[in-house]
């Protein structure tokens, strides 16, 4: 699931590179979704779907991967998509420089397991990819103090 897909990044690219994946791009702007659907048709990407909806209203089965690029703060990204994440799924959010304040504002139960620095050719700006998942529940029988 690519949230706030806009022109289709990274959703269209993921669908093209991973034909075995089913990729859904969701955006609240109908023209952007129409563009993604046109790209899917022109490139014969049968594994790519565009959904015109606000993420809060999207009805869909759970996703193994939920992505965003320039959608919202990390908390505003994970909170409305949490119900759409598969039990073993992960979130991947592209951000500018390492978003320390956003990381600190994540809701309880969300674990950041990797922050990957990115280099974008032609850009001097810092970028990173933040990988998150639901924290593992405590094992039964363990005592926590």
For each predicted feature, which ranges?
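S-adenosylmethionine
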Residues: 18-145
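Conserved SAM-binding loop of SAM-dependent methyltransferases across substrates and taxa
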Residues: 7-20
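Conserved class I S-adenosyl-L-methionine
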Residues: 1-6
């Amino acid at each position: 699931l690519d949230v706030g897909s806009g022109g289709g990044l990274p959703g269209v690219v993921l669908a093209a590179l991973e034909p075995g994946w089913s990729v859904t791009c969701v955006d609240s702007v109908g023209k952007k979704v129409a563009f993604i659907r046109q790209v899917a048709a022109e490139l014969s990407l049968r594994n790519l779907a565009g959904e015109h909806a606000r993420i809060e209203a999207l009805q869909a089965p759970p996703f193994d991967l939920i992505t965003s690029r320039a959608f919202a703060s990390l908390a505003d990204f994970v909170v409305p998509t949490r119900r759409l994440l598969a039990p073993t799924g992960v979130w991947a959010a592209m951000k500018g420089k390492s978003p320390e304040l956003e990381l600190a504002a994540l809701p309880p139960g969300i674990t950041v397991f990797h922050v990957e620095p990115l280099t974008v050719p032609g850009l001097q700006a810092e970028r990173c990819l933040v990988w998150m998942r639901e924290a593992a529940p405590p094992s039964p029988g363990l005592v926590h103090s």
